[in-house]
Amino acid sequence: MPTFLNGDITTPGHLVDPDPRESFADIPEVWDYPDFLDVQLKTFHDFVQDDVPPADREDVGLQAVFNEHFPIKDNRDRYTLEFVNYELDAPKHTVEECIAQGLTYSIPLKATLRLTSKEEEGGEEAIEAIEQEVYLGTLPFMTDRGTFIVNGAERVIVSQLHRSPGAFFEKEIHSNGTELFSARVIPFRGSWMEFSTDVRDVLWAYVDRKKKVPVTTLLRALGFSSDEEIVKMFDLADAVDIGDEDEFEEHLGRELATSVTIEKTIEIVDEDTGEVVDEEMEREVLLPAEHELEEGDWEELDEYDVSRLYLVREDVEDEALDKSTLVETLQKDSSHTEEEALEVIYEKLRGSEAPDLDSAREALERLFFNEDRYDLGDVGRHRMNARLDVDVDTDEKVLTKEDVVGIVRELIRLQNGESTADDIDHLSNRRVKSVGEQLGSQFSLGLARMARTIKERMNLRDADKFTPKDLVNARTIESVINTFFGTNQLSQFMDQTNALAEMTHKRRMSALGPGGLTRERAGFEVRDVHHTHYGRLCPIETPEGPNIGLMLSLCVHSTINDFGFLETPYRVVEDGRVTDRVEYLSAEEEDQATVAQANAPIGDDGHFERDEVRCRHQGDFPIVEPEEVDYMDVAPNQIVSPSASLVPFLSHNDANRALMGSNMQRQGVPLLRSDSPIVGTGLEGRVAKDSRSCVVAEGEGVVEYVDAERLVVRYDEEQDKTDLTFGEPVQEYELTKFRRTNQGTCMNQKPIVQAGDRVEEGEVLTDGFAMEKGELALGKNVLCAFMPWHGYNYEDAIVISERLVADDVYTSVHIEEFEHEVRDTKRGEEELTREIPNVSEEATKDLDERGIVRVGAEITPGDIIVGKITPKGETDPTPEEKLLRAIFGDKAGDVKDASLKAKPGMEGGVVIDTRLFSRRELDPASKKMEEKRLENIESDHERKLADLNERFWEKFFALVEDATSAGLEDREGEVLLTEGADFEEDAFDEVDPSDLSTRAEFTEDEELNDQISTLLRNYKSRRRDIEGTTKRQKHQVEMGDELPSGVVQMAKVYVARKKKIEVGDKMAGRHGNKGVIAKIAPVEDMPFLDDGTPVDLVLNPLGVPSRMNLGQIYETLLGWAGDRLGVKYATPIFDGASLEDVGDELEKAGLPRDGKVQLYDGRTGEPFDEKTTVGQIYMMKLEHLVEDKMHARSIGPYSLITQQPLGGKAQFGGQRLGEMEVWALYAYGASNTLQEMLTFKSDDVEGRSEAYESIVKGENLPSPGVPESFNVLVRELQGLGLEVTLD
């Protein structure tokens, strides 16, 4: 039986109650969804730490980037530039202003830098420090919707899935069948180090991807100089003492693991005198490694006093492994000491001999052991420690000897079959690089460039006095950041067709982009669904086409942890009992766990009802006893994204169709009147709310005023004065009205509450675009029949009723933006006007005095939208001429029409808004108005500030009423209160709250101090908002509108068009059931029910069996029951209505249980032979509208080289007559038509103009000439050196 999902809402006075949905869910909701936009908002605010006072900022994000690059010193250590803190100012413009004027929504970034200079005066060192605030440029700031506005367009920074830093082990099979193993260390920043075995079992190390050296050479260079040390460290050999010959003979026949070397003294003798000039130690190999001990070896060993040997271990069972890789490698190693090893590596790196030992050691250390050049990051160190089972301090961000030894040890274990290679597609090896981190790396790039120029300037300025401002060039950082937002592959123009498309774009994960994969290189494995995607990345929602599997979507419950790995929540199971505790697990942690499904039956006491529970463990699905279960899924829809979660009966659809269904919901055009689906999944409200396309109540309160454009809510004020916030009790919300989205659809908010209503925190107050009663509404519920209809619905085509057109059921509003600039040209300034030369009065009737079309005017193709004249004339006018023209206003003779006109296909447009942006004017009248407006802004600012200060002191004294002072000073160090004094109001008469420090000890009570600090922080935040608003208003008055250089004025006109549904438009349901409208039939011709109701839509039943998307049938039947009963349903995926439930609802509605009824032919009135499945289906109109695709060329542009018409609608191009079309004309023997097509109608330049002339004169067409493409071919051949002439 369905239950009510939201409880019975009976609040009186609501304009429209959000109807509760009857839910079929059996599994209770135990864990709430995270905010769906956290993936953007949280990471950005963690990066900028905008709500944290400078002194309290953690060493992450922007703060960490500054700390990484500062201090900067000159070469002689005389000057040091240190970073103190950074400040973020309020944005100069609002989001709306930026969108309207084509600006970037950004905040000014300022840093306080300290320049310390050391100078020697009279033998003593004098230190001078200058601290200064320096402007570092503007930083694009994220809006509260999780987007960036760059040059007026909303953009999204997509998160990137890339390979995590750390050590990775791989295995491959050589063509001869040998198993080859390799390891790779990938840092965040710095050179890669690689290791690999070859077919002879030698282990090589690749340093900085250059030439290879035996791994033992690298180990020696790191300090493990002797063979004995190396084999002992890896426990590869038995150390055997041979004190006498008997002990030696015990080991005869065994192999040496290391070579036996001796040191000999060689005398260097002068040939002329015979004197010994010098002595040199030389190392000589007595017995090589892998040598089998023989009886004759004892004498040599005894002679040189060798008492210990390292022999290959006997306890290795497998004969193939009796020689260790390392023993083979030692054979290849030409070095024997640390010094020799360092020299070998230096030679490989630099291609020349090392000048000295220190240089050789420094070359290696700079690559992997220097913090400035190498950084594993927190993630890399965490992964290294976990994978290699080493215990290196987490603050150590460079490679260590333990790491290298750990990697070699792991490679030996791999070769011995004791360990397994890494799966590169496992989500423990892939991490998310979110917005904040991407911005951080760009910022780091900009700061590194800036640091270089600062250093250069320091070195150049010797005796000059200079300040931090003289050293810093703000444009350096700004240009890097702007390039990132403008050109980076992950900075994308936001898909804004509807609220779901917007939200999905922000939650997208891309494997492409800088440092990621490319479409061409990505194979099947990396695109495939992996078992670690469960609950983290959606297995359904991914694009079709070349990006399949590379662009993924976050699951509903998925979050990103501090290391950037994806986590998903699970309920903890203890001793077979499911607890209410929830833990987030990363893919690595989950590998150790056994996880039960969300639908496993549980008793009232939390124990599993069955003795055997089906679970997941890594990639398997074992059936285990309840005691062995560690965790349980929190929800059945945990494995999919919000988009796939909105598809009811998803479990009855084939995965390919489910993919199409979830993708096509994003293409649904917001309709004039949207309906939320009768059959939903219960997630519609949450998606609509989290998409931020509606206004949500910030607390409990009462709606004071409502109209179509604004909404005023009075929130309940806390009765006690100890409330630490400064929220305004009365909030006014300006509603978004008919705003154009990125895709040209219409964004419009309308209130769903009435004046006098009580609202609660989180309650939806307005509908956004594609919303109804606070729920997502992408389409319409229509009565549908599954049957063929006179062949019109063949192959997925759709037949619809004329009612859907006449009643505007699928009518949508689309908005186009027209922009026209007025420039200052060499010949004089252009001008907006309605007085245009050689244009009739009729053509300018809708233009106002500025030459801009009036709001409400209807636009047809060719109409003037913005009237503009531009000066013409061969010569520039002299000042006298300019004066005479200004006096007599004679413009007609020397100006030409440069008006903006409506393009073809613009029928039915209505002007809904016009804007004119102008530079600041400086005439006396304007100046006077400006001064008055500035005065008003200033007085308004002072009033708001005084009110805020009063509220602060009121709350402050309420907190410290019974407390005594711990000794209080202001920021300048001046004593305000002595220790033990009471907090008297008189003592603070002259004190401004902003002078108090958030870190001061106000009282002896720690808890009270924290409360005061919070109050002070909230005060400063509110004050910053007020000052930012004032600054913005003043800037607007003083500077006028910001326009590009050379532009004097810019006019923008917004034209709205209603698009009714028509033949050729694409429609789709939520189950991948898409089709194109082939016929709009009269209502009277449509099949009708017993009671005479005609159906709205006829779908082909053959579209169901082969596509295997039965969800549409379930939805149709349940929708019909809901329509009859006046109920809306929630059928969550994997926990929804069964066939039995659907049948029950149909019976309750008085409909046949199987949903099949007798239909009658509208044309004849005769009953059809068979009963037909009928019901209410939810269908959307997609943005692939035929009107946007229809195109016909008259005269348009030609390609310069081939002289053929261009292709495509955007270029106003022609239709290509391709190879196959030419064959068709051959086949019909239409030689004249073919010749015409290839000459006059294409690229016979002379023939074209002659044909035009003859048509005009009414003469016969001339003979065709030579097509230009033939001339191009001739020139190509001539370019190859072949002489081709045409006789």
From Swiss-Prot:
A GO term for molecular function: ribonucleoside binding
InterPro entries assigned: DNA-dir_RNA_pol_bsu_ext_1_sf, DNA-dir_RNA_pol_bsu_external_1, DNA-dir_RNA_pol_su2, DNA-dir_RNAP_su2_dom, DNA-dir_RNAP_su2_hyb_sf, RNA_pol_bsu_bac, RNA_pol_bsu_CS, RNA_pol_bsu_protrusion
GO CC field: DNA-directed RNA polymerase complex
CDD domains, alphabetized: RNA_pol_B_RPB2
Reaction(s) catalysed by this chain's protein: RNA(n) + a ribonucleoside 5'-triphosphate = RNA(n+1) + diphosphate
GO biological process: DNA-templated transcription
EC code(s) of this entry: 2.7.7.6
Annotated PROSITE patterns: RNA_POL_BETA
Pfam families, A to Z: RNA_pol_Rpb2_1 (PF04563), RNA_pol_Rpb2_2 (PF04561), RNA_pol_Rpb2_3 (PF04565), RNA_pol_Rpb2_45 (PF10385), RNA_pol_Rpb2_6 (PF00562), RNA_pol_Rpb2_7 (PF04560)
Entry keyword set: DNA-directed RNA polymerase, Nucleotidyltransferase, Transcription, Transferase
Family of the protein in this entry: Belongs to the RNA polymerase beta chain family.
Subunit text: The RNAP catalytic core consists of 2 alpha, 1 beta, 1 beta' and 1 omega subunit. When a sigma factor is associated with the core the holoenzyme is formed, which can initiate transcription.
Function: DNA-dependent RNA polymerase catalyzes the transcription of DNA into RNA using the four ribonucleoside triphosphates as substrates.
Name of the protein described by the UniProt record: DNA-directed RNA polymerase subunit beta
